[in-house]
């Protein structure tokens, strides 16, 4: 039960669009979400009140940077104020930051470190991005976006990709994922610009999802080398 009503996730999922495309990303809240990226170049929106999917065929500003599909990017924000961050296109790992205002996309200042399979949390005015894979290695770099520019923060304690982030910028929880040695169980808490080691997750995993805050988080699914 949410906000006095029962959530009913019905409506047909579009076929052949971004929702079913590998490597896409999602922003928004449970009954109002935006799906974009992946191997399709569409943007799909979902309204949980009307239980309807729609193809958002709005024009893309700066087509050189976002008219093409891209995989393994991340997103933060809401349906009418969302960021698309990094990813990979045609074998090139990107540092791009794209802003969706509910109608059109535009390109903002890029990250210092181009990356894919990274982790992001926050909103369009305070977005934290950590880890991921660069052209040469898995990275431990951490950056913060203030709505206009990116700034480097303290490195996370591990070079990790495909981890999850809970919470918000400067108060985040980084969990599991994959480093050079394999799947990980480690978790780290960010307080301000300092990262602390906290308790391990129950099993090593990657490609998982997460929900909650930095102090009350849930990990969901994923791939593990200990069961499934």
Predicted regions and their residues:
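Kelch-like beta-propeller repeat domains
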Residues: 1-228
């Amino acid at each position: 039960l949410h906000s006095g009503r029962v959530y009913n996730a019905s409506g047909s999922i579009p076929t052949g669009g971004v929702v079913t495309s590998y490597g896409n990303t999602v922003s928004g809240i449970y009954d109002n979400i935006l799906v974009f990226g992946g191997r399709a170049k569409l943007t799909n929106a979902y309204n949980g009140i009307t239980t309807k999917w729609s193809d958002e065929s709005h024009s893309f500003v700066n087509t050189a940077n976002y008219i093409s599909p891209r995989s393994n990017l991340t997103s933060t924000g809401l349906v009418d104020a969302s960021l698309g961050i990094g990813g990979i296109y045609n074998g090139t790992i990107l540092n791009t930051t794209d802003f969706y205002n509910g109608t059109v996309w535009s390109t903002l200042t890029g990250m210092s470190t181009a990356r894919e399979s990274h982790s992001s949390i926050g909103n369009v005015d305070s977005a934290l991005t950590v880890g991921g894979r660069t052209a040469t290695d898995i990275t431990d770099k951490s950056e913060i976006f203030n709505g206009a520019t990116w700034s480097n923060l303290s490195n996370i304690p591990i070079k990790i990709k495909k981890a999850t982030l809970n919470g918000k910028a400067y108060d985040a929880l980084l969990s599991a994922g994959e480093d050079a040695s394999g799947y990980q169980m480690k978790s780290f808490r960010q307080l301000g610009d300092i990262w602390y080691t906290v308790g391990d997750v129950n099993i090593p995993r990657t490609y998982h999802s997460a929900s909650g805050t930095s102090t009350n988080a849930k990990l969901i699914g994923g791939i593990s080398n200990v069961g499934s």
